[in-house]
């Protein structure tokens, strides 16, 4: 029974991390983050 709880917690952690990462990537591509030299290097330069 304890193993199932651990698996569920692990899945929740992965889902939360993935959601945060998706939000961060969307923010960067949306241009809400101020454009910097790193944005140009990675190819996400704003038009």
UniProtKB/Swiss-Prot annotation:
Entry function: Lysis proteins are required for both colicin release and partial cell lysis.
Record has Lipoprotein as a keyword: yes
Signal peptide: 1-19
This protein's record includes keyword Signal: yes
GO-annotated cellular components: cell outer membrane
Main location: membrane
Gene Ontology BP terms: cytolysis
Recorded topology in the membrane: Lipid-anchor
Sorted UniProt keywords: Cell outer membrane, Lipoprotein, Membrane, Palmitate, Plasmid, Signal
Name of the protein described by the UniProt record: Lysis protein for colicin E8
Species for this entry: Escherichia coli
InterPro entries per the UniProt record, alphabetical: Lysis_col (IPR003059)
Record lipid sites (N-palmitoyl cysteine): 20
Subcellular location: Cell outer membrane
């Amino acid at each position: 029974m304890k193993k199932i709880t651990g698996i569920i917690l692990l899945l929740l952690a992965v889902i939360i991390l993935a959601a945060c990462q998706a939000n961060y990537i969307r923010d960067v591509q949306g241009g809400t983050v101020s454009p910097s030299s790193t944005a140009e290097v990675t190819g996400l330069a704003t038009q």
